Amino acid sequence: MANEEVDRRAEILNAAVELFGTLGYYGTSLQKIADRVGLTKAGVLHYVGSKEGLLTAALDEVYDSETEDILTDIVREPRPLIADMWRRIVAVNARRPIQVHMFSTLSAEAIDPNHPAHEYFANHELHNADTALNIRWQVPEGVDTRRLLNA
């Protein structure tokens, strides 16, 4: 993809993240996104394929990428502290309130099994928990890491 196309796609994703956070998935139309970025609805679809494709990209590429980076960094550490992971996550989320708002809004909507992000949210915590459980955390003797992470 050429730089201009990458920039335009990022602009579309940013608009979608903001609108999904404010209006939810069902309240956000492709036309609203198109109006926000100065394209036609067909122009938006050229970059993202479908509204569900846009939702997936907003969650995977915009929201999850930073969280995954934190877990990847922690996995490389010999004996990380669980509290350090939470501090990093809080610090990242404090810098991205719009993305956190989107995540919160969509997770509430996705309780409905017919929501297009239902599976994503059903599996999201399981994936992160599995990753976290495979890290050799530095915890005091006798502390159940699984129980601590699930608290």
Predicted regions and their residues:
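Hydrophobic alpha-helical connector segments
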Residues: 57, 70-100, 128-131, 145-149
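Helix-turn-helix
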Residues: 8-11, 15-57
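Amphipathic alpha-helical segments used for helix-helix packing
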Residues: 95-122
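Solvent-exposed, amphipathic alpha-helical segments
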Residues: 15-22, 69, 73, 102-105, ...
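Short alpha-helical functional segments enriched in proximate histidine and acidic residues
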Residues: 19, 65, 131, 135
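N-terminal intrinsically disordered/low-complexity leader segments
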Residues: 1-7, 143-144
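Short, basic, alpha-helical segments at the C-terminal edge of helix-turn-helix-like DNA-binding modules
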Residues: 60-66
